[in-house]
Amino acid sequence: MAAQRPLTIALVAGETSGDILGAGLIRALKARVPNARFVGVAGPRMQAEGCEAWYEMEELAVMGIVEVLGRLRRLLHIRADLTRRFTELKPDVFVGIDAPDFNITLEGNLKKKGIKTIHYVSPSVWAWRQKRVFKIGRSTHMVLAFLPFEKAFYDKFNVPCRFIGHTMADAMPLDPDKNAARDVLGIPHDAHCLALLPGSRGAEVEMLSADFLKTAQLLRQRYPDLEVVVPLVNAKRREQFEKIKAEVAPDLAVHLLDGMAREAMIASDAALLASGTAALECMLAKCPMVVGYRMKPFTFWLAKRLVKTEYVSLPNLLAGRELVKELLQEECEPQKLAEALLPLLANGKTSHAMHDTFRELHQQIRCNADEQAADAVLELAQ
C-alpha cells in the first residue's frame, strides 16, 4: 500500500518582509505537522525553516516601473512555470505572501486548476483601486488580513477574509522600556527626546527633511535640553539627509542612527514621521507622534482623487478617528508641526491619553498572527 503523501504547502514570497512572514508560518505549521513539505519561491529565512526553493526570492524583488519592464519577460516566464509545476504537484494549499501584482494572478491560475489558494497580507484595496477586491475574490479562497478594518472591507464584498492580527504587534512588548532604549542610544533619562523619521524612500527624505529639521530647531528654543534622534534606513538615505542638514540646520546637534528606528521610537517622548508602516511601529512603541507628509503637487492632486480613506496613518484608521495629528502638503510646515508636537513633548495629559489608546489598539491586533495563519492554512487543507 502506497505511503500517504505528506501535507504539501506551496508558497511564494517576493521580498524580505514576505520571507519573514513565510518563515513564521512554516515554523507554526511544522510544530503541528512535522512531516509537512514546503515548496515554492523562498528567501533565506524560509529556506532555513526547510522550504524547498524552486526560485530564489530575489528573482521577484523588483521595484519601480523601469525595473519591472526590464524584467517582465523573466517574471512572466517564472509565473507560467510555477503555474505548470504547482498544477502538477497539486499542493494542499497555495499561499501567496504579499507581492500582489505577481501572486494574485498566480492564485487565480491555480484556483482554476482546483488548487486552494490563500493571499497572505491584504493589498491596500480599502484605500485605493478598490475594484481590485473583485479580482482578489475570484483568485483566492481566503485573504489573511493584519488589521480589523481590512476584514470589514472584504466582508462588504463577500470575499472570505480572516483577521489574524499583526506580526509586528506580536513582536513588540505592550510596555516598552524607554530608559533601556535611551541607554542603548546614549540619551539621558531626564532629557526631552524627539525622533525624526523622514521616510525610507529618497523622494520622501528629499521632500520632508528640511521642514523636519526646522521643526526641531523651533522645538529646541522651547526645550533647550531636547535630544533629537534620526534613524535612517541605509547609508544612501543617511548621506542624503546629511547633505540637507548641512544646508538647512548645520548647527543643530542630532544623533544620526543607522537603522534602529524602533529603539529611537521607544526612547523618544514624541516622533515626527512620514506616514506608512513607521506610524504603526511608532504606535506599538507607545511613542506619541505627529504625521507630516508632502508630495509633488500633481501626485497629491491625484492621490486625493484615488484614496478613499479619511486618514492616511494606520493609527487613525485603527482608531476610526484623528488620534494622531496629520499635517499634509501645505500644512506640513515647521510652525504647524512644532505646534502639534509641543503638547506631546510636555509629557502631560495629551501624550498620556495617546499612549493609553496606543496600548488598547496594540492589544486589539496582538493575536499571535503566525498561529492564526497556520490555523487558516490547515482548515483550508482539510
Swiss-Prot record:
UniProt-recorded name of the protein: Lipid-A-disaccharide synthase
InterPro entries xrefs: Glyco_trans_19 (IPR003835)
GO cellular component entries: membrane
HAMAP family xref list: LpxB
Stated family: Belongs to the LpxB family.
GO terms, biological process: lipid A biosynthetic process
Enzyme category, top tier: transferase
CDD domains in the record: Glycosyltransferase_GTB-type (cd01635)
Catalytic activity annotation: 2-N,3-O-bis[(3R)-3-hydroxytetradecanoyl]-alpha-D-glucosaminyl 1-phosphate + UDP-2-N,3-O-bis[(3R)-3-hydroxytetradecanoyl]-alpha-D-glucosamine = lipid A disaccharide (E. coli) + UDP + H(+); a lipid X + a UDP-2-N,3-O-bis[(3R)-3-hydroxyacyl]-alpha-D-glucosamine = a lipid A disaccharide + UDP + H(+)
Signal peptide positions (record): none
Protein's job: Condensation of UDP-2,3-diacylglucosamine and 2,3-diacylglucosamine-1-phosphate to form lipid A disaccharide, a precursor of lipid A, a phosphorylated glycolipid that anchors the lipopolysaccharide to the outer membrane of the cell.
Domain of life: Bacteria
One term of GO molecular function: lipid-A-disaccharide synthase activity
UniProt pathway annotation: Glycolipid biosynthesis; lipid IV(A) biosynthesis; lipid IV(A) from (3R)-3-hydroxytetradecanoyl-[acyl-carrier-protein] and UDP-N-acetyl-alpha-D-glucosamine: step 5/6
Annotated organism of origin: Salmonella typhimurium (strain LT2 / SGSC1412 / ATCC 700720)
E.C. designation(s): 2.4.1.182
Keywords on record: Glycosyltransferase, Lipid A biosynthesis, Lipid biosynthesis, Lipid metabolism, Transferase
